Amino acid sequence: MLFPLVVHPWNLILAGLAGLSCCLVLWQWLAARRFPLHQKANARDFTPAVSVLKPLKGCDETTETSLRSWFAQQYAGNWEILFGVADGQDTVCDIVRRLITQNPSVSARLVVCENLTGANAKVAKLARLQQLAAHGLILISDADVRVTPDFIGNMVAPLRAEQTALVNCFYRLANPTTTALQWEAVAINADFWSQVLQSTTLKPLNFALGAAILVRRQALEEIGGFASLVDCLADDYQLGRQIAEHGHNLALCSQVVECWDSPKDWRQVWKHQLRWARTIRVCQPGPYFFSILSNGSLWPAILAVAALGSGNLWFGLLAAGLCIGMRILLAQDLQRRFTPNRRLVSPFWLVPTKDFAQAILWLGAFLGTSIEWRGRRMKVRRDGTLLAAD
């Protein structure tokens, strides 16, 4: 009884969309498989001086260990680390001062960045720290990022190519301690990095990934420094885009940094994902609109429902089962490749759950401009800049 399914126009369209989503998922997996993930760079004879800038605000139980990993860098070249806070009474200051005292051989200092301007406080701190940085390479990193001792050495290696001005790397959610975070880990540890690599099969990388970015100071100054980004939500995206527009190349390091987070519930994770969705929609409205086509569980599920209405239940269930099963297998393989010891952090059933929820987030990205970010209500303008909503 396949004939009614084949001739019904809507079923034909849905079958085509389900097939297209499977092809896009497979393409995404193949692009990721070709990337030399976790490979170390052998660049001991290339050790340019580096300034590490770390904007901070508040702390949790993971902060000290994450910051300590930066003091453990085994880099043969000159390097320094500058920590920036807006308030000298911030609870993170005690951690930083303690780490500086415990590691006297590391050139490190805490900078209180007062009277900051701009909607993006993190970038405002970076702009202040940039003025104090001593070296020609600037490495910026979020507070929750944890790295291996050879991280700086691996990041500088792509800069042997003089035309390369910016190096970034992938990041993974390292400690999804709640079901909500395990759900989010599917988006980060399976989908995000593989989608970035999928995009590079069509055109060179022209945006940056925010967890850790290394940039030549000269290229940064060409775009006006961090001061030109203080009102941007997606400051990492804009940093990479503007440097690429100035004719420089961007590179991906094969290292993966870890992002450690405190436990979060569904409400907190949903707000984060909605902010992320609206950010991507503003940055790349066209590609984001068509990204719904790559939802590997949504279209097969809709096809199964449509097949039920046309009397082809078994065909619909079989087609949906094969497509969603492939999506689960490939997503779990991507998570294993991305994680040390090939360890899974998300159970298989969260893969289709993530896809179905992603469809709602996709719609929500187009239905509003407000976000909640760092405890503040903000509105995102069409150009990606922020406006206080309260």
Where are these regions (language model features)?
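N-terminal membrane-anchoring/stem segments of glycan-assembly enzymes
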Residues: 1-46, 185, 194-196, 331
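Membrane-embedded multi-pass helical conduit in multi-pass membrane proteins
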Residues: 19, 44, 291-370
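Cell-envelope/extracellular polymer assembly enzymes that use nucleotide-activated donors
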Residues: 48-51, 80, 238
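Acidic donor-binding segment of Leloir-type glycosyltransferases
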Residues: 67-117
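Acidic donor-binding/catalytic loop of UDP-sugar-dependent glycosyltransferases
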Residues: 91, 136, 142-158
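Short aromatic/hydrophobic "clamp" motif used to bind/position activated sugar donors
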Residues: 126, 138
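Conserved nucleotide-sugar donor-binding
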Residues: 134-136, 209-223
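Catalytic donor/gating beta->alpha subdomain of glycosyltransferases that bind UDP-sugars
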Residues: 159-192, 218-221, 226-288, 383-385
